[in-house]
Amino acid sequence: MKIAILAGDGIGPEIVAQAVRVLETLRSDGLKLELEQGLLGGCAVDAAGEPFPAATRTLVAQADAVILGAVGGPRYDGLPRQLRPEQGLLGIRKALNLFANLRPAVLYPELADASTLKPEVVSGLDILIVRELTGDIYFGEPRGIELRNGQRIGYNTMIYSEAEIRRIARVAFQAARKRSRRLCSVDKMNVLESTQLWRDVVTETAGEYPDVELSHMLVDNAAMQLVRNPRQFDVVVTGNMFGDILSDEASMLTGSIGMLPSASLDERNKGLYEPIHGSAPDIAGKDVANPLATVLSVAMMLRYTFDREEEASRIERAVKKVLADGYRTADIYEPGKMKIGTAAMGDAVLASL
């Protein structure tokens, strides 16, 4: 298993360091891992003059999976667009042909009070949103702003091909098989032809997965149901724009984005794994960042790229034990618990492994 480690910017090096410690512990227990560091984002601009240098491009192409910390920071905002750190992230997604974004939203019992919803509504929350990343209205052509009949008009094209829908549906069905075998497909087929095709193709694809229960929901209802009764969902699959919105909504049900990992996969389940939070330059170097989302990204990598369910579950159990034992970083701290720093949280996870 060859893994590229891209710490990135801001708190990235601190949180990724704890994830690497977890990987090294698994390696010492017999898991065959090869780890290699690379540069992406602002640190790559500083060292190589571009956010996604050739050496990193080669590294990630040869790796089986990539662990990323975070990229960006205000000191790069004045750079030309092509040199901004975020272009490195877009570049790696394109270079690796990543089309499926997996975003879990899990509420740990110990953090139930951190949610903005009542504990009885969100207790037991464990959702996986599978979002298509490369199509839809974000990338459809034609698009633009132009002058017509004396006034400006803006237009975009919402478009999906049958092949694009089928491949993301298969990712979602396979993910559902690893969980409770329930999949909800979200669309707006009552007014949008592109999502009528979405529903048709997902329904056809369900025939390949008779062991998975498929349901459909309109996106406006799904947004409402995520707040009204989020526990009804297990795996949700949807298009790029709807997934962009719903995954952010679901993440806030958990109370802390510092706890949430993500995966972006290609057709062979090679993946880029990263926390959903940003680089938080204001707390960089202060040993206060929460590394648990990055640690949980390692668990996702083991599950979805390497099919190592035992090791993935082992990491997740360790995180649950750390929380049950009362350890908290500043972002999830509450009175009566033990506030600890980034490295100490890494120590606690290793002790629980």
Curated annotation (Swiss-Prot):
Residues that coordinate or bind substrate: 93, 103, 131, 220
Alphabetized UniProt keyword annotations: Amino-acid biosynthesis, Branched-chain amino acid biosynthesis, Cytoplasm, Leucine biosynthesis, Magnesium, Manganese, Metal-binding, NAD, Oxidoreductase
Domain of life: Bacteria
Residue numbers marked as site, Important for catalysis: 138, 188
Binding annotation for NAD(+): 73-86, 278-290
GO molecular function (one): 3-isopropylmalate dehydrogenase activity
Keyword set includes 4Fe-4S: no
Record-listed Mg(2+) binding positions: 220, 244, 248
Cofactor-binding details, from the entry: Binds 1 Mg(2+) or Mn(2+) ion per subunit.
SMART domains in the cross-refs: Iso_dh
Cofactor(s) needed by this chain: Mg(2+); Mn(2+)
E.C. designation(s): 1.1.1.85
UniProt subcellular location: Cytoplasm
InterPro entries found in the cross-reference section: IsoCit/isopropylmalate_DH_CS, IsoPropMal-DH-like_dom, Isopropylmalate_DH
GO terms (BP aspect): L-leucine biosynthetic process
Matching PANTHER family: 3-ISOPROPYLMALATE DEHYDROGENASE
Oligomer and partners: Homodimer.
Function: Catalyzes the oxidation of 3-carboxy-2-hydroxy-4-methylpentanoate (3-isopropylmalate) to 3-carboxy-4-methyl-2-oxopentanoate. The product decarboxylates to 4-methyl-2 oxopentanoate.
Name this polypeptide is given: 3-isopropylmalate dehydrogenase
Species whose genome carries this gene: Nitrosospira multiformis (strain ATCC 25196 / NCIMB 11849 / C 71)
Organismal lineage: Bacteria, Pseudomonadati, Pseudomonadota, Betaproteobacteria, Nitrosomonadales
Protein encoded by which gene: leuB
